[in-house]
Swiss-Prot record:
The keyword Transport applies. One of its GO terms (molecular function) is proton-transporting ATP synthase activity, rotational mechanism. Keywords: ATP synthesis, CF(1), Hydrogen ion transport, Ion transport, Membrane, Mitochondrion, Mitochondrion inner membrane, Transport. This is ATP synthase subunit epsilon, mitochondrial. GO terms for cellular component: mitochondrial inner membrane; proton-transporting ATP synthase complex. It comes from the Eukaryota. The keyword Cell cycle does not apply.
Length: 70
C-alpha cells in the first residue's frame, strides 16, 4: 500500500481536526489519573490570555483573563 492510497486517519474520517482529537485524548488521560496527579494536571489545564480593545486606532489597557475547561 503506497502513501497515496493509505487509509484516512479515523479522526479525520470522523470530521475532527487533529487538535480536537488530541484535546479529547488528553482529557481522557487526565480523567484516568489518581490523586495527587489529577489535581496537578487540572491546575495546568487553565489558559491565561489578555484582551485589548482598540479605540480610534489606539490600544486601551489590556485585561488579563483566565479560562478553564470546566
Amino acid at each position: 500500500m503506497s502513501a497515496t492510497t493509505a487509509a484516512v486517519p479515523f479522526w479525520r474520517a470522523a470530521g475532527m481536526t487533529y487538535i480536537g482529537y488530541s484535546n479529547i485524548c488528553a482529557a481522557l488521560v487526565r480523567n484516568c489519573l489518581k490523586e495527587p496527579f489529577k489535581s496537578e494536571a487540572a491546575s495546568r489545564e487553565k489558559v491565561h490570555f489578555s484582551i485589548s480593545k482598540w479605540t480610534d486606532g489606539k490600544q486601551e489597557k489590556p485585561t488579563v483573563r483566565t479560562e478553564s475547561d470546566d
